Amino acid sequence: MASLTQQPRYKYTLFIHVCDNNQELYNMYNTKIEHHNSQLLTNTHPDSGFDVFVPKQTIMKHTSVNKVPMGIKCAMVKHKSSQDVPCGYYLYPRSSISKTNFRLANNVGIIDSGYRGVVTGMFDLIYTNQEETCDIYTRLLQICSPTLEPFKVVLVNDDNSLGSTQRNTGGFGSTGR
């Protein structure tokens, strides 16, 4: 069986770096990535998204938008002939978020190809006038390729492996109002 890194069967690869030497989160992503990538080889209809874990218990306030850093940095590339081209990707709510009072405040995150900062969700609360707790390792969001095609995922040990860009870590309005 060909390795996923030798012959890209899929057009896109997502590279993930777990921040702050969080070994437990790293192990969770490692397990999730192994399962995700095995599905690319065995499932004729693999998932379009890759779930993102909330890295720590978080109190969400009902009176404001809640910024929740996901504890990972990412880069996505598109495989074109003999080269890999950086590309943007999407951060979508998982369908199961509808069973909670959490809502992704901007509905979908568009992550530009040059962004190398921490992946972050901005949430507000609906249907409640009280703060709520989001438990550690809850999966509220998923990363999707620009075309919603399945993609392979690679866990990297160093955020330098994601490549440096002119933009780097600027996000949420950093390029203009």
Stretches with model-predicted labels:
Residues 1-177:
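DUTPase catalytic domain/fold
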